Every structure is written in C-alpha cells, then in structure tokens.
C-alpha cells in the first residue's frame, strides 16, 4: 500500500494528496474481490486510515429500505432506514451525495451517536439505480468536503461494479462490525 503522508492536517477535511493516495489503494483493494469482501475491506480502510471518519457503514437497498451491512465504529440503532427517512434515506431517494456540516442543525438527522457532529452519505449507483450507500460520520463539525465526496464516490463506484458482476448480490441478515 502507498504510504500516507503523516504530516498534520491543516484542515480537518480531506486534502487532494490524501485522496489520490487513498484512491490508488482503493483500486488495488478492489481488484479481484467479491462485493461483500470489498465492502468489508473498504469500511476497514476508511476507519483505519482517515482519522476524522469516526463511523463508516454501508447500507444496501433491499425491498424499499436501507439495511446496514459492514460498519466500523460504535453499533448504530439504525440498522434499517426507510427511503426518505433521515439523511441516509434522503440521499438514497435523491440518488445523490449529501454533506451535512452540522447534524445538530439538520432536522433529517437520525441520531446514532451523541458525539456525531457531521455526516456525508454517498449513494452506490448502477446507472440511475441506487444499490445502497456509504455513510460516514465525524465527531467534528464541517469535517467533509468535495475531496471526501470524490473519494467516497470512487469507492461507491467500485462497490457498485462488484455488485453488478456478482451472480447474487451481497446480503447481511444483521449488521457486521469490521475490525475491533
């Protein structure tokens, strides 16, 4: 894996150099992995290598609701989310990414953790069809920017491609904690 710059961040949000390094790692990780394995690997990568990502999870769209699959961070009470409900449901309904700089000012926010201050949700798309989404929370306000969005959109694209190649889409009967 490529080394990530260890110099302190000037800003909390992702910078372009870090995005490029992590994007290269995404490509290597995705090569030859089936969809479920890829999802677990990317959740673990983001949680381990991006300090301001304090919770990372992947929701899959099944029968009109988002179901939590692999995640890293504290367990969430929101393992199933209806389309249109919360920030996750809004992103899935719209088929576009949503960045919330301060969850305390967004009435759509479904409280998962008292420490969460900002959130980004990026849908996984197959054309115009939403397959699921990547949800990331931070305990810092204004933690996400367009570089975070670009990185997560690349990950979402890789996952969507793996799901599209799968004979059977991945499915979790219960959320799966990645890492420790």
Residue ranges of model-derived segments:
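A short, aliphatic-rich beta-strand micro-motif
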Residues: 118-125
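Intrinsically disordered, low-complexity terminal regulatory regions
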Residues: 2-76, 163-180
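Regulatory sensory and allosteric helical modules in signal-transduction proteins
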Residues: 61-114
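Regulatory loop-to-helix N-cap segments in sensory/regulatory domains
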Residues: 2-7, 137-155, 162-171
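Short glycine-/small-residue motifs
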Residues: 132-133
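Short, small/polar residue-rich loop motifs at catalytic or cofactor-binding pockets
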Residues: 53, 116-118
């Amino acid at each position: 894996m490529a080394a990530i710059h260890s110099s302190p961040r000037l800003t909390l949000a992702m910078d372009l150099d870090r995005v490029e390094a992590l994007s290269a790692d995404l490509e290597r990780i995705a090569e030859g992995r089936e969809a479920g394995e890829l999802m677990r690997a990317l959740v673990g990568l983001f949680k381990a290598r991006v300090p301001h990502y304090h919770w990372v999870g992947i929701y899959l769209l099944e029968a009109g609701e988002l179901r939590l699959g692999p995640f890293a961070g504290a367990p969430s009470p929101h393992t199933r989310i209806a389309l249109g409900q919360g920030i996750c449901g809004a992103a899935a309904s719209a088929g576009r990414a949503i960045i919330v700089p301060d969850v305390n000012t967004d009435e759509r926010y479904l409280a998962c953790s008292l420490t969460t201050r900002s959130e980004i949700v990026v849908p996984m798309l197959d054309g115009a069809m939403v397959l699921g989404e990547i949800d990331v929370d931070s305990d810092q306000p204004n933690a996400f920017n367009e570089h975070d969005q670009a990185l997560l959109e690349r990950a979402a694209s890789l996952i969507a491609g793996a799901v599209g190649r799968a004979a059977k889409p991945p499915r979790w009967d219960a959320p799966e904690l990645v890492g420790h």
